[in-house]
Swiss-Prot record:
Entry keyword annotation includes Chloroplast: no
Species of origin: Bifidobacterium longum (strain NCC 2705)
Function: Transport of potassium into the cell. Likely operates as a K(+):H(+) symporter.
Topology of the protein relative to the lipid bilayer: Multi-pass membrane protein
Basic and acidic residues bias spans: 710-721
Region (Disordered): 649-678, 693-736
Tagged with keyword Ligase: no
Domain of life, source organism: Bacteria
PANTHER family associated with the record: K+ POTASSIUM TRANSPORTER (PTHR30540:SF83), OSMOTIC STRESS POTASSIUM TRANSPORTER (PTHR30540)
GO molecular function: potassium ion transmembrane transporter activity; symporter activity
Protein name, as recorded: Probable potassium transport system protein Kup 2
Lineage of the organism: Bacteria, Bacillati, Actinomycetota, Actinomycetes, Bifidobacteriales
Reactions the enzyme catalyzes: K(+)(in) + H(+)(in) = K(+)(out) + H(+)(out)
Length: 736
């Protein structure tokens, strides 16, 4: 599993040496413009940024704070949201920024690595004649990468893990090779060098230098987000090796820059990349191959992190329910087809807009600084409420100060492409906010009825033979977690317009557990044999095939006598003659012109319903399509007050009452069907009594066929003192 950790979580931070030093030289005016002070200052800032941000903040502190093994900003928010509603704001903002960064990482990592092919002498002419060749190769690699995601990160991680192990070993060896000529660069371990150069007049980039240094820490947030995929212990075990390899390579590049700062061959070179130039031409071939592989792996780290984050956002009701697959046996390794497709299309769009890594890197990093800042805020709140208040203050002040410098420096990228990531962040944030607000508004109108309120009406409808059956069984799918009461939406659906009479009504909800293969259900029958509240508890790897489970429950209850016997005379989709017809009903909320809701609330609801329409339907999620489910729309926030009466403007016509052709009795003498003193009334009463008697006979026959209770409960059925014992009562809730 440690090899999987290498492949899944370290790809992003492992590609930073490809472009960090190159970006530093570009900001300082080239290799000829830097001196020893500049090189040591840059190395010092890089080393301490990796140490403080990645090692201290994420590896040593953040990873100790998990939600059932899951990491990331949403998992962290789930732990502390009880401390204030305002915490949703930084959590949403940080999550949106992370997802926006997930679009840019594959584009910048893979394109920058592929462009290394241009440094190989035999291929220089080919790329000069075909400038778009690099872009085409990058597109092919990205399409292949997203296509293999459905195989799961376990299989991908094993392959990528071995490659990353070779990659970081290669980084360390190349770094040591160049360090052997000048070990003095380790003076940069002194943080004074970094602070001094940052504020030195020789720093041509000014505060923007911190934006370059920040590139060395990209991937740190992915360590925390991907913790659920590979486990905290595996990251602890592998991180020391990763950090040593990174430091050796950065310092090796620094030693090469000091050794060649006066070499005209390199000082005149545009877009000089010390990473490739510090190697001999023969080694450079291997470097290009490995760097392309590392770029692919870096993309993998962000893709898996995006899957995890969207899954957590769904559980928080910040995003719509999406189809989730679990290719491996652990819940942390998941695959979301819709997210995979959106990321793929968005990444290709980035390549189409920015063309090459130079322009993509101008937009890269700004969104990630926002994620790191919001994570710091949430971690500080967690530490504060954990009783470590002094530590919380020190932690929050220190890391907010550092990351504020990163953010200010990265804002210089806004006009050079940073606007794109901000646009993506705003779009994702809009989805989260509107979905959350829309859900809150829907739940604000949700009401529940106690059994004493709904049972009399249902009992009357159940025994009213004058109304034909809508179906033998009507199954309502609901997201309501209440099991002791009934959602009024279901009650109104049953009685709206033409009442939906049935032999049995079912209200069904699904709860996904953290265990992979849980298959349980509980039933509440409210003391009747015609209404059942069912709650499924299904493991995250168990298929949510509701029709199959509903049939099992009906058979189970029929065998115990809790559900009256049913027989299907005509052919059905499920071909199950022992169960009557089943009709599934889904209730969707909708705004109406007369809905009484604020403009902001209406916007949130309309946006939510538009997103829901694009995200898919529960009909597909639960396999209901073959059963022709009924989708009902119920209005939100509609006033029950009658509108003012209309005024008629034309002249009303008086229609004379027709004269009867034969004498009729006085209306007062016409028997009332509900008047038991009249013949018709007595007939209706007799018919009702017959129906009730038939219902009692059916219930008694079903009870007689039911198997006797086992164990201690069976003893209660024995006679005492020659008198039959009372019939044992069924518990309100049974767990299967």
């Amino acid at each position: 599993m440690a090899i999987v950790a290498l492949g899944v979580v370290y790809g992003d931070i492992g590609t930073s040496p490809l472009y960090t030093a190159q970006t530093f030289l570009a900001g300082q005016g080239g290799l000829g413009s830097v001196d020893r002070e500049a090189v040591l200052g840059m190395l010092s800032l890089v080393f301490w940024s990796i140490t403080l941000i990645t090692t201290v903040k994420y590896v040593l502190i953040a990873m100790r704070i998990d939600n059932n093994g899951e990491g990331g900003i949403f998992a962290l928010y789930s732990l502390i949201r009880k401390y204030g509603a305002w915490l949703a704001i930084p959590a949403m903002l940080g999550g949106a920024a992370f997802l926006a960064d997930s679009v840019l990482t594959p584009a910048v990592s893979i394109s920058s690595a592929v462009e290394g092919l241009q440094t190989l002498p035999p291929l220089e002419g080919l790329f000069d004649e075909n400038p778009s060749l690099t872009l085409m190769i990058t597109v092919v690699i990205i399409v292949i990468l997203f296509s293999v995601q459905s195989r799961g990160t376990e299989s991908i991680g094993k392959v990528f893990g071995s490659m990353v192990l070779v990659w970081f070993g290669f980084l360390a060896i190349v770094g040591v090779t160049n360090l052997s000529n000048d070990w003095s660069v380790f003076e940069a371990l002194n943080p004074v060098y970094g602070i001094k150069f940052l504020f030195s007049p020789n720093n041509a980039a000014g505060i923007a230098l911190m934006g370059t240094v920040f590139l060395s820490t990209t991937g740190a947030e992915a360590l925390y987000s991907d913790m659920g995929h590979v486990g905290r212990g595996n990251i602890y075990f592998t991180w020391p090796f990763i950090k040593v390899a990174l430091v050796l390579n950065y310092f090796g590049q620094g030693a090469w820059m000091l050794a060649n700062s006066d070499n005209p061959q390199y000082t005149a070179m545009e877009s000089l990349n010390p990473f490739f130039q510090m190697m001999s031409p023969n080694v450079r071939y291997l470097a290009v191959i490995l760097s392309v592989s590392a770029g692919v792996i870096a993309s993998q780290a962000l893709i898996t992190g995006a899957f995890t984050m969207v899954s957590e956002a769904t559980r928080l009701n910040w995003m719509p329910h999406l189809q989730v697959r679990y290719p491996a046996r652990t819940r942390g390794q998941l695959y979301i087809p819709v997210v995979n497709g959106v990321l793929c299309v968005s990444t290709l769009a980035v390549l189409a807009i920015f063309k090459d890594s130079e322009h993509i890197s101008a937009a890269y990093g700004l969104a990630l600084t926002i994620t790191m800042i919001t994570t710091t805020v949430l971690l500080g709140v967690y530490l504060w409420h954990s009783g470590k208040r002094v530590g919380a203050i020190v932690f929050t002040v220190l890391f907010l100060a550092i990351q504020a410098m990163f953010f200010i420096a990265s804002m210089a990228k806004f006009l050079h492409g940073g606007w794109f990531t901000m646009l993506l962040t705003a779009a994702i944030l809009f989805v989260m906010y509107t979905w959350n607000e829309g859900t809150k508004l829907e739940r604000a109108q949700r009401r529940h009825m106690r059994p004493n309120d709904f049972l009399p009406a249902l009992d009357k409808l159940h025994s009213d033979f004058r109304i034909p059956y809508f179906a033998d069984n009507i199954v309502y799918l609901t997201s309501d977690s209440e099991t002791k009461r009934l959602d009024t939406d279901i009650f109104f659906s049953i009685f709206a317009d033409h009442p939906k009479r049935a032999r049995a009504w079912w209200a069904v909800s699904v709860e996904t557990t953290d265990e992979p293969f849980t298959r349980e259900y509980s039933v509440e029958d409210f003391g009747t044999n015609y209404i059942y509240r069912v709650r499924f508890r299904l493991g995250f790897k168990v298929s949510q095939s509701i029709p199959a489970y509903i049939h099992q429950i009906m058979h189970d209850l029929s065998k115990t006598g809790e559900l009256p016997k049913q027989k299907s005379i005509y052919p059905k989709v499920d071909a199950d003659p022992d169960i009557g017809t089943i009709r599934y009903v889904l209730i969707h909320k909708a705004l109406m012109p007369e809905s009484k809701v604020s403009a902001r609330g209406a916007l949130s609801l309309q946006a939510k319903y538009a997103i829901r329409h694009m995200a898919g339907s529960p009909v597909k999620w639960f396999g209901l399509a073959p059963y022709n489910p009924l989708v009902e729309v119920q209005p939100l926030f509609v006033s029950t007050r009658r509108p003012p009466r209309l005024k008629r403007t034309d002249t009303a016509k008086t229609i004379p009452t027709p004269t009867p052709t034969r004498a009729v009795a006085d209306p007062a003498a016409v028997p009332d069907p509900m008047d038991t003193t009249s013949g018709l009334g007595r007939l209706v009463q007799e018919l009702d009594a017959a129906v009730s008697a038939e219902a009692r006979k059916t219930a008694e026959a079903a009870a007689a066929d039911a198997p006797a209770e086992q164990g201690d409960k069976g003893d209660k059925g024995k006679a005492e003192n020659g008198k039959p014992a009372a019939k044992p009562q069924r518990s309100a809730k049974q767990k299967r």
